[in-house]
Amino acid sequence: MKKMLGKLLITAGILVFFAVVVKDVFAAGLGFINGTEADSASASPRDIDSMVIESDSKDVRIIAEERSDISAGISGDSGKLFVTENKRKLELTVKEKEFQFLNGFNRSTLIVRLPYDYKGDLAVRTSSGDVSVAGNDHLALSGLNAVSASGNTSVTDVRIQDLKVKASSGDVSISNTVSKTAGIDLASGDANLVHVSGSLDVKMTSGDFNAVLKKVTGPVSVTLTSGDANVSLPQNGSFAVNALSASGDVSSPYSFADKGHKEQHHITGTQGSGRHPIDIKTDSGDLAIR
C-alpha cells in the first residue's frame, strides 16, 4: 500500500512538472508579441508623444528625473523586454521568461526613467503586478491611464491633465497630484488620496475611500457600494456637498458657511458660492466630511 501511494505521488509530481513545462513552452511559442526583444530601451522625449507599457506579472516602476532620454530596463532575471517605436509611440512589453518555476520567488521589475521634459501620454496595463509613478514634483503629463487586474497602484508628485486608474483587485494611492480630471474605478480595494487637486470621479464596489482634497476645481463624485468614506475638504473654496449613506452614519465636523441639511444618513452644506458639486454616496458604510 505504501509503495503504491509513493508511486502515485511520484506520478503526480511528474505530471505537475510537465504541465508547468508545457505551459511555459506554449506561452513562449504561441504568445504573439509586437516588438524586438532587448535588454534595455532608450528614446528621445522629442521623438515620443505617447508611451504604452504592458506587463503580465511584473511590477512597473516609473521614475521622473533630470535626464535627456527615456530609459527602460528590467531588474531581476525572470522577465523579458520587448520594444517597439513607431510613429512617435513607444511600446514596452514585459513577459515572463520560460521555466520560471525553477527560479523560485525571484521577481523582476520593469523600471522606466522619464526625463522631466516628457509631456506626452502614458498608459500602463498589468495583469498581476504593482504600478508606481513618481513624478518628483517635476513631471507633467497630458494623460496617465493605469489599468491593473491584480496589484496596487501608486501615483505621487505629478501634474496630469487627465488621470484614469482602473483595478479589479488592489489598493490605489495618489498623493501630491494635480489633475484637471481624475477617475478611479476600483472593484475591490481601498483608495487613499492625499493632497490631491482637481476634479474627481470615483466608483468603488468594495473598499474604503480616504481623501484629503487640497483644492477643488471641478465636480467631485464618489460612489461606493460597500465601504466607508472619509473626506477632508479644503478650508477655502466654492463647493456644495451632498453626502448620503443608505445604510450607515454620516457625520461632518466641517464648518460649512451654510449647512443646509443634517441628519443621521444625509448631510448637505455649502462653502463659498457652491460652484463645484461634491457628491459622496455609499450603499453600505459610514461617511465623514472633515
From Swiss-Prot:
UniProt keyword list: Signal, Stress response
Reported induction: Induced, via the two-component regulatory system LiaS/LiaR, by antibiotics (vancomycin, bacitracin, nisin and ramoplanin), cationic antimicrobial peptides (human LL-37 and porcine PG-1), Triton X-100 and severe secretion stress.
Disordered: annotated segments: 257-290
Effects seen without this gene: Up-regulates expression of liaI which in turn induces the liaRS two-component regulatory system.
InterPro entries xrefs: Toastrack_DUF4097 (IPR025164)
Domain of life: Bacteria
Protein name: Protein LiaG
Organism: Bacillus subtilis (strain 168)
Organism taxonomic ancestry: Bacteria, Bacillati, Bacillota, Bacilli, Bacillales
